[in-house]
């Protein structure tokens, strides 16, 4: 089996990576940085996001698994002291593939420039270049829904619903549901201007089109990458036809992860 290990880059993560690679020697495992069948992320969720984007061109052929060396590893289900056991499991090759939904993003421009296409594992946000009020028309399935005024909009996946979306008051959605969630960022609501004021959960056959009314230079953040787009006509968000594949060697229940990340203080019975 072809593999690659992506490290956070700190001493602890690099040490674990080197130890894992040493154990892979003289086995059927072949290190391949271009076309790996399994990618091991050693670090935090940010490291796994980087690994995901690095290999986003071959999602149907690559599975991901994470060892977390930081404080919070929502995607990484293995602890540093379990890395030897993980290597043995990988060498045995007996694992289940779990698939999570992704966001497909298309940025359309007013000039002759071709649309740019992106994919997100956690979320995508849309704001103005200078952090002024974003004024944008929101359409759902081709029908106008509202005119939004506020700091911006966040579109998240079910697995990403536990990240920035949660801080914005959005719902937590189980990754088995193929959906995206649209959540407002500090919307303006008064007697003159009105938005729905609640997160919207859109199924896979719906799409969301956001059209800036005044601002044409838009800042988008797609997972960990922020990009400036000039002369933006609209941005379309929908559930991607592609999915991320996780290699599961043992149960890793979503709601237990939520509990352990946000509720547990380590003293639960």
Curated annotation (Swiss-Prot):
InterPro entries membership: ATP-NAD_kinase_N (IPR017438), ATP-NAD_kinase_PpnK-typ_C (IPR017437), NAD/diacylglycerol_kinase_sf (IPR016064), NADK (IPR002504)
Record GO biological process: NAD metabolic process; NADP biosynthetic process
Molecular function GO labels: ATP binding; metal ion binding; NAD binding; NAD+ kinase activity
Gene3D superfamilies cross-referenced by the UniProt entry: Probable inorganic polyphosphate/atp-NAD kinase, domain 1 (3.40.50.10330), Probable inorganic polyphosphate/atp-NAD kinase, domain 2 (2.60.200.30)
Top-level lineage group: Bacteria
Alphabetic keyword roster: ATP-binding, Cytoplasm, Kinase, NAD, NADP, Nucleotide-binding, Transferase
Binding site for NAD(+): 45-46, 122-123, 149, 151, 186
GO-annotated cellular components: cytoplasm
Compartment list: Cytoplasm
Top EC category: transferase
EC number: 2.7.1.23
Keyword NAD assigned: yes
Reactions performed catalytically: NAD(+) + ATP = ADP + NADP(+) + H(+)
Cofactor requirement: a divalent metal cation
Active site: 45
Free-text function comment from the UniProt entry: Involved in the regulation of the intracellular balance of NAD and NADP, and is a key enzyme in the biosynthesis of NADP. Catalyzes specifically the phosphorylation on 2'-hydroxyl of the adenosine moiety of NAD to yield NADP.
NCBIfam families membership: PRK04885.1
Protein family per UniProt: Belongs to the NAD kinase family.
HAMAP family noted in UniProt: NAD_kinase (MF_00361)
Protein name per its UniProtKB record: NAD kinase
Gene: nadK
């Amino acid at each position: 089996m072809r593999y690659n290990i992506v490290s956070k880059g700190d001493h602890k993560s690099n040490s674990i990576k080197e130890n894992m690679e040493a154990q892979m020697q003289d086995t059927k495992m072949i290190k391949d940085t271009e076309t790996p069948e399994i990618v091991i992320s050693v670090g935090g969720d940010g490291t796994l996001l980087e690994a995901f984007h690095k290999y986003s061109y071959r999602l149907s052929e690559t599975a991901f698994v994470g060892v977390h060396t930081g404080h919070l590893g929502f995607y990484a289900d293995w602890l540093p002291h379990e890395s030897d056991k993980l290597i043995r499991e990988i060498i045995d090759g007996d694992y289940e593939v779990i698939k999570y939904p992704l966001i497909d993003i298309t940025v359309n421009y007013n000039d002759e420039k071709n649309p740019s296409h992106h994919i997100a594992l956690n979320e995508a946000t849309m704001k103005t270049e200078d952090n002024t009020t974003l004024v944008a028309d929101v359409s759902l399935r081709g029908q106008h829904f509202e005119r939004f005024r506020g700091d911006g909009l966040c579109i998240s996946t079910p697995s990403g619903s536990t990240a920035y979306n949660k801080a914005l008051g959005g719902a937590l959605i189980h990754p088995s549901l193929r959906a995206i969630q649209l959540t407002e960022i500090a919307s303006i609501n008064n007697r003159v201007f009105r938005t729905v004021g609640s997160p919207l959960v859109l199924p896979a056959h719906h799409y969301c089109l956001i059209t800036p009314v005044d601002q044409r230079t838009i800042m988008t953040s797609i997972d960990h990458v922020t990009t400036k787009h000039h002369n933006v006509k609209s941005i379309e968000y929908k559930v991607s036809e592609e999915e991320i594949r996780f290699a599961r060697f043992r149960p890793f229940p979503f709601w237990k992860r939520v509990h352990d990340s946000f509720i547990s203080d380590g003293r639960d019975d």
